[in-house]
Amino acid sequence: MNFNKIKSMHFPSDVYIGHDAILNIGSVVSKFLKSGEVLLITGENTYNIAGKKVLSNLNDFDVNVIIASRATRDSIKSIEESLKNRRSGIVLGVGGGSKIDIAKKIAYDLGIPFISVPTTPSHDGIASPRASIYDGKSVYSEEATMPSAIVADTSIMVLAPYRYVAAGAADVISNITAVLDWKLANRLKGEEFSSTAAVMSEYAGRELIERSSMIQPGLEESIWLVTKQILASGAAMAIAGSSRPASGSEHLFSHAIEILGPGSSIHGEQCAMGSLISMYLHGGDWELLKNTYRKIGLNTRAESYGIGREVAIKALSIAHRIRPSRYTILGESDLSYNVAERILSITGII
């Protein structure tokens, strides 16, 4: 039998994590920029928090700074239109999840390297080859450029509200249920499965559970701990060639919440709630997850984020519709109102 299988995997070749890591940004850019200018994508707040410091270390380069907003297809198209008469040679994403999603998607479209410079460890997108893009109706996980390098300065990231740290930890912990869903899809639907990616992704989540007592407000070592496991999660996705190792039914619930009305909740908080639902349905120890979230200071009650009871029930009922091709424990049919309400009540989400 002839073997003709081939798979391409891309990983960051340079990773700097720690205090004052941003001082290395100049040498990192020098390594990957072949020609043209540096395109620095950031937000209004993150420009003041980290963008200015990045610029001060890029005096030897021509830099085009773009202040971006939400990661939508329209905003990305608008930025790309503005670049038509410029020679962008590398993209730096400086900020939280949405700014990094915009940067990695533009880098993918332009076919140039991308460097991730996160200002908060709010979710695993800072180290993955996927971008969450909103099209006005729904959120889609799209193929994007894997970071060629990651520069995560813990002295900057620790300044972000602790809420984002806890949410980032929860996003990684929810990998555990994503892997359960992936195994289920492999068993019932014959979906391609990577044991290596699954083990790496689940390990990242369980490592944070075991060390959850170290995830505390104002502690730079907490940033270090969470960011390292975010990198492991990103590597798992690179191995799998998709977001499967880190995105299952918990993420479908999160996206449904975002569509129906997220209140004040952010991605990792939604995934935390979703992971309780998923683990309960899988017959696993959902109370361990709930206690871990409580330990790191993350609330899993929908009303605490302004998410109404009816919104939560509707979100769970329709979550499987968000990405029909991704089979999970939620199945392929809407849950009834009563069943969804019961699951949410048992897990304490409503």
Swiss-Prot record:
Q: Which SUPFAM superfamilies match?
A: Dehydroquinate synthase-like (SSF56796)
- Residues at which Zn(2+) binds: 171, 251, 267
GO cellular component, alphabetical, reads: cytoplasm
Q: Where in the cell is it found?
A: Cytoplasm
Q: Which family does it belong to?
A: Belongs to the glycerol-1-phosphate dehydrogenase family.
Provide the function of this protein: Catalyzes the NAD(P)H-dependent reduction of dihydroxyacetonephosphate (DHAP or glycerone phosphate) to glycerol 1-phosphate (G1P). The G1P thus generated is used as the glycerophosphate backbone of phospholipids in the cellular membranes of Archaea.
Instruction: Output this protein's name.
Output: Glycerol-1-phosphate dehydrogenase [NAD(P)+]
